[in-house]
């Protein structure tokens, strides 16, 4: 059996995989959508959001960290797993301040698109309405900490690609938050630039370029035209 002939089962369908693939990587390559937030194809898996949780041979596991091997039986799109994903999404929405109608990221936001995909029509839980700052100290980039989902993509991009290590995650439990690695804690006191990988990696609306709001009209944005699962199918 060649590398490309190896396969595992995803929701009853045989999926090919390459050596070193995770379940999520293999599924994404062939256009099979497994919901996720913190995973990005250019970075090592993080496994923090748990949205990609699947059942592997009957046991729950994160699809972004489980290595694909022959004879795996993976379940993803089941009523039970999608209900769990919806609950996790609802918790993310109430834990932050996500006001989609007025957010510049609306239509391009992976959190919003995933909530639509999972049929989330309300937060269900009581809103926290946390008091979080907006950092406008940088001349070209705005940081709105209200929307952070702690995916750490900006942390990894700044450290591993830009070589600047401008962001970190600090605190514990409900107090966990995104930090700027400067003496003042302000982005304006760093050398971050718009061309940095970290400047464009945020899946929600935390890191935004200034003076570019709504350049692409609502209704013509990435997930306005097609759902997140349809985009996954297009990439195959």
Where are the regions a protein language model picked out?
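Fe-S ferredoxin-like electron-transfer domains
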Residues: 50-54, 59-236
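Short glycine-rich loop/turn motifs that provide flexible caps or phosphate-binding loops at active sites
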Residues: 11, 19, 46, 172, ...
């Amino acid at each position: 059996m060649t590398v490309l002939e190896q396969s595992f089962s995803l929701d009853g369908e045989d999926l090919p995989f390459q050596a070193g693939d995770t379940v999520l990587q293999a599924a994404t390559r062939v256009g099979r959508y497994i919901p996720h937030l913190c995973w990005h194809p250019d970075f090592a898996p993080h496994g923090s959001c748990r949205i990609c949780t699947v059942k592997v041979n009957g046991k729950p596991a994160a699809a972004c960290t489980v290595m694909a091997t022959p004879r795996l039986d993976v379940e993803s799109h089941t009523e039970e797993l999608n209900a769990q994903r919806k609950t996790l999404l609802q918790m993310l929405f109430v834990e932050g301040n996500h006001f989609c109608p007025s957010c510049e990221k609306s239509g391009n936001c992976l959190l919003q698109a995933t909530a639509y995909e999972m049929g989330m029509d309300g937060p269900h839980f009581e809103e926290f309405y946390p008091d979080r700052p907006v950092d406008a100290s940088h001349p070209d980039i705005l940081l709105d900490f209200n929307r952070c989902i702690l995916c750490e993509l900006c942390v990894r991009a700044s450290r591993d690609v830009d070589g600047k290590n401008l962001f970190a995650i600090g605190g514990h439990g409900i107090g966990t938050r995104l930090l700027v690695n400067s003496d003042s804690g302000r982005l304006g006191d760093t050398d971050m630039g718009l061309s940095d990988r970290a400047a464009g990696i945020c899946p929600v609306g935390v890191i935004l370029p200034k003076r570019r709001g709504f350049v692409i009209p609502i209704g013509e944005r990435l997930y306005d035209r097609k759902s997140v699962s349809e985009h996954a199918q297009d990439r195959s």
